[in-house]
C-alpha cells in the first residue's frame, strides 16, 4: 500500500493508477516528461508526471493541476530556499496563496474559514505540494525534514486571496 511504501503523510491517499495519472496530466498543457526543477533535499528531477502522481494521491481534480504545477515550480525557485525550510528545526512549512480568475474557476474558498475544512481545492492543492516534496525530493520527517515539532502546514496550506474585494483594499 501507499502507507507501507511511506508515500503518504499519514492520511489516506487516492491510489495513483495509470488511468488516474493520465487524467491528471490532461488537466494541463505541460508534457509529462518536462522537468520543473530539482526537488530538495535529494535534488531529484521533479517531472510533471511525478507531480501528477502526487496530485492524484492528494485527491486533486485535473482542473486543479495547473495550480499545483505552479506551486511546485515556485517552491523550486532557489530564492524560496525549500532545502532550508526542510533543514530547519523550526516549525515552518510551505504556504500557497492563489489569486486571479483560476480561484473561482476551480472553486477555491477565499471568503471565510479559508484554512479550515470543507473545500477540496484548498485542501488538496496544498497537500499535493507537500506530498511532492516528500515523495519526489525525499523531505520526510525524522529523516531529512528536521522540524522539531512539525506543523499543520506540512500536510497542506493553501488558500485563495480576496484582493478583488474593495473593502479590503488600502486607500
Language model region names:
Residues 166-171:
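Conserved small/polar residues in nucleotide/adenosyl-binding loops
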Residues 2-87, 94, 108-147:
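Alpha/propeptide regions of enzymes that mature by internal proteolysis
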Residues 148-155:
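Beta-rich nucleic-acid/ligand-interaction surfaces
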Residues 98-102, 112, 129-133, 155-163:
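Short, structured patches in soluble enzyme cores that scaffold and shape functional sites
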Amino acid at each position: 500500500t501507499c502507507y507501507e511504501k511511506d508515500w503518504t503523510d499519514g492520511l489516506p491517499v487516492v491510489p495513483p493508477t495509470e488511468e488516474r495519472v493520465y487524467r491528471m496530466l490532461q488537466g494541463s498543457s505541460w508534457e509529462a516528461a518536462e522537468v520543473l526543477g530539482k526537488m530538495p533535499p535529494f535534488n531529484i528531477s521533479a517531472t510533471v508526471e511525478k507531480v501528477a502522481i502526487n496530485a492524484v494521491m492528494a485527491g486533486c481534480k485535473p482542473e486543479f493541476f495547473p495550480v499545483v504545477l505552479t506551486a511546485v515550480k515556485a517552491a523550486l525557485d532557489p530564492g524560496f530556499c525549500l532545502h532550508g525550510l526542510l533543514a530547519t528545526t523550526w516549525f515552518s512549512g510551505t504556504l500557497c496563496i492563489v489569486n486571479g480568475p483560476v480561484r473561482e474557476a476551480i472553486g477555491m474558498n477565499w471568503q471565510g474559514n479559508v484554512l479550515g475544512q470543507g473545500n477540496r481545492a484548498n485542501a488538496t492543492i496544498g497537500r499535493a505540494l507537500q506530498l511532492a516534496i516528500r515523495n519526489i525530493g525525499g523531505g520526510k520527517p525524522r529523516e531529512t525534514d528536521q522540524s522539531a515539532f512539525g506543523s499543520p502546514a506540512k500536510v497542506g496550506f493553501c488558500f485563495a486571496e480576496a484582493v478583488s474585494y474593495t473593502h479590503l483594499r488600502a486607500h
